[in-house]
């Protein structure tokens, strides 16, 4: 009998610790995303939504604010700063050295995509949206817009991609 009572008390103590740990864990998880996937999704969504708010903003060479206009790297810098608080370098070429290099087959929304538009590599940058589309500030006389990476112009000029968002 004493052995049974000891086992019962031990089991009750263990069950109490498990219930307490589970309750604490569920309270902690209520305030934060439950998985790496959700954290990625939330960060990527923030980047994309911030970028889409700027569709229609005019292009200006060297531009880095919404009111006076944006160039491609100014657009990407502003989006990442406003959505994630991330400070990216000023030029597309410098951005091409940040984050993790990824293959085109591994692209996920929020990744940076790079192109050769000025007869030099990594001279243009945009934000990948998914389904082979990206968001960018294209050129003088144009506005921030969405384009298809499968258009022949972009296919010929594609230089690579970088992942900036952690956990992506």
Model segments located where?
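Structural motif
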Residues: 110-112, 132
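Stable alpha-helical elements in mature extracytoplasmic
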Residues: 43-51, 72, 76
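Catalytic cysteine-centered active-site loop
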Residues: 34-38, 57-109
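Aromatic- and glycine-rich peptidoglycan recognition patches
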Residues: 2-5, 21-43, 86, 101, ...
